[in-house]
């Protein structure tokens, strides 16, 4: 992964690198590989993530179609 450093601005380059790594899911992957995960636990986690993803998409679709009200903004 490469990030250009312009005008010796290392802070900006680091922010860009972190953003790229976040988007690619590298931080999450590193956290997951910290400890061994049994194959059965991995399957269960992936299934739970898939269920969560499907529910979220269904909720967004229902909000878009006007079946349920959109969540109010927090104060």
UniProtKB/Swiss-Prot annotation:
The residues that cross the membrane are none
One GO cellular component assignment for this chain's record is: ribonucleoprotein complex
**In which domain of life is the source organism classified?**
Bacteria
| Pfam families cross-referenced by the UniProt entry | Ribosomal_S21
Q: Which InterPro entries match?
A: Ribosomal_bS21, Ribosomal_bS21_CS, Ribosomal_bS21_sf
Spell out the molecular function terms from Gene Ontology: structural constituent of ribosome
Which GO biological process categories is it annotated with? translation
Q: What keywords are annotated for this sequence in UniProt? A: Ribonucleoprotein, Ribosomal protein
Task: Please state which protein family the record places this protein in.
Answer: Belongs to the bacterial ribosomal protein bS21 family.
What is the name attached to this protein's record? Small ribosomal subunit protein bS21A
Q: Which organism is it from?
A: Agrobacterium fabrum (strain C58 / ATCC 33970)
